[in-house]
Amino acid sequence: LNSGVGGFSPVRWNDLLGAKVGDGGTANERKTRMKVLVACEYSGRVRNAFMAMGHDVISCDFLPSEDDSPYHFQGDVRTVLAEAGPFDLMIAHPPCTYLAVSGLHWNTRGVLVDGRPRAELTEEALDFVRLLMNADVPRIAVENPVSCISTRIRKPDQVIQPWWFGEDASKKTCLWLKGLPKLEATNRLPGDDKTRRANQTPGGQNKLGPSPDRWKERSRTYQGIADAMAEQWGGLVPGGEMRTIQTGEQECLHFNPRS
């Protein structure tokens, strides 16, 4: 699905998810399913982690999906929320360009971006974060690095590190949670926050040098974190109710896969 394709329609779960629906059981086995939106994700890592658990998942971003998945909407998340809801769970990765503390010093120096004050773009980015946090979804996780979200909206519920989840990397990642528990470390590597990781120079800086794609490379969710989100949040059901389907019989609203 891309931004040029409008509308959503019901499709059978077994047609949409294929063998994933029936894996590990008979055709009549009833399983819990959640409808999940992964907002502002082009890599597909979080989407695919939840899909591997058998959930009904769509990602969206203004960029196309790197894996050319049919379960990606290239466009505005507001369109998805308005036309494809309700969702049980949303995980959002709002762009951090004008939010991260590492760049906020430019806001006080009169820097212009395409003729607009950078500080103005920070305000717009904060408004977008508020929109995501206040979306009509019972369970929400908003992810960002250390940013002005903490001082302008509220402090994060949790700050995690990739090396808690088996990734030899250091990157403080903040989570603002609604209706979700904190993530538990799954494979904490030896060391602490002072330990130099594979993605760092001896001075503690990120090894990725300046390039047009640096922001893109750094914005990908680490696989260990994506897997932990799917494993720990994928079994939760909003409102204490079980959302179940009967394989091959129940129909559910979803995006039409592109042809």
Residue ranges and their predicted role:
Residues 2-259:
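Conserved active-site and SAM-binding loop architecture
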